[in-house]
């Protein structure tokens, strides 16, 4: 189970700069293709063999310069709920403020590890100023400069040292892990209740290393599966989810710990920006996807044409990834609930598909010969062989070419589409690599 590090603090203390430093990104370099610019608030980091996720909880706040104490309190409460380690960023140039005091008063009550990061410490004189932050009662202020990177290596040593040393969950790897995700009021709780019904369907609860219950195993309708973080979805949330970044951050852990994500959409509202944010997280983590259009019972004049219009709109918004199942369901009336689980299991099986090398070459090489990669500066690109890589999270294929550097993304998409035409890989991402033969 991955660890989650949350960055909190009042506006303008350098949270975004620290986030960019830890995730080795710059805000100017953000992939806009996913249909959202909010990806920059969530990233992956790795330090001395430890992989973890980083969230800038303030990053989802619009006009963050105008954030008041109550908004900061919500962010910090969210971090306490969701994170394994909390980085509380303060500004040594401006010193202790009332908002810093307010944040510290909340953090002092948590049992989660809190590291106070004294940012903008660019010289020795400012290091002396950091002593002022002892009054916040959170231990030693850790001096860094997020802008120059000074002190961030030692900070990362401290962060990974705070991660739980307990063993990982003892999960049966052959049993699929499903996560139900979506924006507030899309019907997550309703569909989970429809899946599992009464508590007697619970087989085992496996305690997470840092959570009350991350995985719960169920046997229902002839299926054997884990639901990820259902306790978190079913409990009454301490933090209101009226603002979209709350539910997006809450989705991170569920997505990371799943094999297949069941993305709930509200049929009465269509696909919205928040749905795109969650879809982007699913894509970046390379998880299987089943889209469920819930509350289908509330749609009037339902027919095949209306259904087709919905499908086209969803695939258009989620492009370029369009090969995923869409199910029109009602958690309330239990319409097609069985179909949702059945499809999620099929997507899980697609993720583990193995295609024999001989068969792959037999199908793909004639296509490549008929439609070769475009030549580059008069040089012809030849692909002679392909194979599926072993032991990968999702189906991954390598094509060996004489000039791999000239094979561009559109041709990789062509290869992916042809593989999808030949084999049923609906719902699972696949990777295409071009290597020197």
Curated annotation (Swiss-Prot):
<comment type="function">
    <text>GTPase that plays an essential role in the late steps of ribosome biogenesis.</text>
</comment>
<protein>
    <recommendedName>
        <fullName>GTPase Der</fullName>
    </recommendedName>
</protein>
<feature type="domain" description="EngA-type G 1">
    <location>
        <begin position="3"/>
        <end position="167"/>
    </location>
</feature>
<dbReference type="GO" id="GO:0043022">
    <property type="term" value="F:ribosome binding"/>
</dbReference>
<keyword id="KW-0342">GTP-binding</keyword>
<dbReference type="Pfam" id="PF14714">
    <property type="entry name" value="KH_dom-like"/>
</dbReference>
<dbReference type="GO" id="GO:0042254">
    <property type="term" value="P:ribosome biogenesis"/>
</dbReference>
<dbReference type="GO" id="GO:0005525">
    <property type="term" value="F:GTP binding"/>
</dbReference>
<comment type="similarity">
    <text>Belongs to the TRAFAC class TrmE-Era-EngA-EngB-Septin-like GTPase superfamily. EngA (Der) GTPase family.</text>
</comment>
<dbReference type="InterPro" id="IPR006073">
    <property type="entry name" value="GTP-bd"/>
</dbReference>
<keyword id="KW-0690">Ribosome biogenesis</keyword>
<dbReference type="InterPro" id="IPR015946">
    <property type="entry name" value="KH_dom-like_a/b"/>
</dbReference>
<feature type="binding site">
    <location>
        <begin position="119"/>
        <end position="122"/>
    </location>
    <ligand>
        <name>GTP 1</name>
    </ligand>
</feature>
<feature type="binding site">
    <location>
        <begin position="9"/>
        <end position="16"/>
    </location>
    <ligand>
        <name>GTP 1</name>
    </ligand>
</feature>
<dbReference type="InterPro" id="IPR016484">
    <property type="entry name" value="GTPase_Der"/>
</dbReference>
<feature type="domain" description="KH-like">
    <location>
        <begin position="353"/>
        <end position="437"/>
    </location>
</feature>
<dbReference type="InterPro" id="IPR005225">
    <property type="entry name" value="Small_GTP-bd"/>
</dbReference>
<feature type="binding site">
    <location>
        <begin position="182"/>
        <end position="189"/>
    </location>
    <ligand>
        <name>GTP 2</name>
    </ligand>
</feature>
<feature type="binding site">
    <location>
        <begin position="294"/>
        <end position="297"/>
    </location>
    <ligand>
        <name>GTP 2</name>
    </ligand>
</feature>
<dbReference type="InterPro" id="IPR031166">
    <property type="entry name" value="G_ENGA"/>
</dbReference>
<dbReference type="InterPro" id="IPR032859">
    <property type="entry name" value="KH_dom-like"/>
</dbReference>
<keyword id="KW-0677">Repeat</keyword>
<comment type="subunit">
    <text>Associates with the 50S ribosomal subunit.</text>
</comment>
<feature type="binding site">
    <location>
        <begin position="56"/>
        <end position="60"/>
    </location>
    <ligand>
        <name>GTP 1</name>
    </ligand>
</feature>
<feature type="domain" description="EngA-type G 2">
    <location>
        <begin position="176"/>
        <end position="352"/>
    </location>
</feature>
<dbReference type="InterPro" id="IPR027417">
    <property type="entry name" value="P-loop_NTPase"/>
</dbReference>
<dbReference type="Pfam" id="PF01926">
    <property type="entry name" value="MMR_HSR1"/>
</dbReference>
<keyword id="KW-0547">Nucleotide-binding</keyword>
<feature type="binding site">
    <location>
        <begin position="229"/>
        <end position="233"/>
    </location>
    <ligand>
        <name>GTP 2</name>
    </ligand>
</feature>
């Amino acid at each position: 189970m991955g660890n989650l590090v949350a960055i909190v603090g009042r506006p303008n203390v350098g949270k975004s700069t620290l986030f960019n430093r830890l995730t080795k990104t710059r805000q100017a370099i953000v992939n806009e293709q996913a249909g959202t610019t909010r990806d920059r608030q969530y990233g992956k980091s790795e330090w001395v063999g430890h992989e973890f996720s980083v969230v800038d909880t303030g990053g989802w706040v619009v006009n963050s310069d105008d954030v008041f104490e109550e908004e900061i309190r919500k962010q910090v409460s969210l971090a306490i709920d969701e994170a394994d380690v909390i980085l509380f960023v303060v500004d040594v140039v401006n010193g202790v403020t009332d908002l810093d005091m307010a944040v510290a008063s909340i953090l002092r009550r948590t049992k989660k590890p809190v590291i106070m990061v004294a940012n903008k410490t660019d010289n020795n004189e400012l290091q002396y100023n950091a002593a002022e932050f002892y009054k916040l009662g959170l231990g030693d202020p850790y001096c860094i400069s997020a802008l120059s990177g000074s002190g961030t290596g030692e900070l990362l040593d401290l962060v990974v040292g705070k991660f739980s040393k307990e063993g990982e969950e003892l999960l049966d790897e052959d049993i699929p892990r499903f996560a139900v995700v979506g924006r507030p009021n899309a019907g997550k709780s309703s569909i989970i209740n429809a899946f599992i019904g009464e508590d007697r369907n619970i087989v085992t609860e496996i305690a997470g290393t840092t959570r009350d219950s991350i995985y719960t195993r169920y046997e229902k309708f002839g299926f054997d599966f884990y639901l990820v973080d259902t306790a978190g979805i079913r409990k009454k949330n301490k933090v209101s989810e009226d603002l979209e970044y709350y539910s997006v951050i809450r989705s991170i852990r569920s997505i990371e710990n799943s094999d297949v994500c069941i993305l709930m959409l509200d049929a009465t509202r269509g696909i919205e920006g928040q749905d795109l944010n969650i879809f982007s997280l699913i894509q970046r983590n390379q998880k299987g996807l089943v889209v469920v259009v819930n509350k289908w019972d509330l749609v009037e004049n339902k027919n095949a044409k209306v259904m087709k219009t919905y499908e086209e709109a969803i695939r258009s918004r989620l492009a370029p990834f369009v090969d995923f199942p869409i199910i029109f369901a009602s958690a309330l009336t239990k319409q097609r609930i069985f179909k949702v689980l059945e499809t999620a299991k099929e997507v899980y099986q697609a993720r583990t598909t193995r295609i024999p090398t001989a068969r792959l070459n037999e199908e793909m090489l004639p296509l490549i010969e008929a439609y070769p990669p475009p030549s580059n500066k008069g040089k012809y690109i030849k692909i002679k062989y392909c194979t599926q890589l072993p032991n990968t999270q999702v189906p991954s294929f390598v094509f060996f070419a004489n000039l791999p550097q000239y094979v561009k993304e559109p041709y990789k998409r062509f290869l992916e589409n042809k593989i999808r035409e030949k084999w049923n890989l609906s719902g699972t991402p696949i990777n295409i690599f071009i290597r020197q033969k």
